[in-house]
Amino acid sequence: ASICEAIAARQPDADCVIFRDRVFSWAEIQNRTRRLAQVVHEAGIGPQRRSPRVPPEHLNNWESSQSHLALYMLNGNEYLESMLGCWKAGTVPFNVNYRYVAEELRYLLTDSSAEGIIVHERFTPVLQAVLPTLKKQPKLILQVADDSGFGLLPGAVDYESAIAQASPTLPSFLTEGWSGDDMYLCYTGGTTGM
């Protein structure tokens, strides 16, 4: 999180992300990821006040004391923004293999204790089938529009609308702790041999 901020401060107008016909400067990515972090924070995901996390020595090697947020997405600027936005909100993003069937997705969301999901529209039919089977419902579902035609999932919030309405100003307790323990939780999807 802090590396993105440092580069944006030094070269705000330089290209940061180029995806298809869209070009985003470092300043634009800084702004978009801060706004996304605010959306995540306001949903009650991640630290809500200054508080110590569970010390690493009190956790097993595979455990995380932070909130987890699922990235059920294709590659694109929104994926990178989501990773950075999660870190800026003090949460841990993790990947979801978009080839998963409902039972695999249910297992992953349950095992990870996902508190939120950012999902491309094309994957909402599988997610919609899984949501009623989860014991713990996500606090936030952000949906990235695409050309699939499925429409907005009930209870979901449009990604672009959410970040457009959010403030880029974050609570100081979040910004003071950036990058001290940024993590990315990686679930293998069984595609290594493909």
Predicted features by range, described:
Residues 1-16, 28-31, 35:
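A short N-terminal helical cap/helix-turn-helix that marks the beginning
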Residues 12, 143, 164-187, 194:
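Conserved pre-ATP/AMP-binding loop-to-beta segment of ANL
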Residues 22-23, 39-103:
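Conserved AMP-binding/adenylate-forming
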Residues 42, 88-166, 173-175:
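Structural core segment of the AMP-binding/adenylate-forming
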Residues 34-38, 113, 193:
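Solvent-exposed alpha-helix faces
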Residues 21, 28, 74-75, 100, ...:
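Short beta->alpha linker loops
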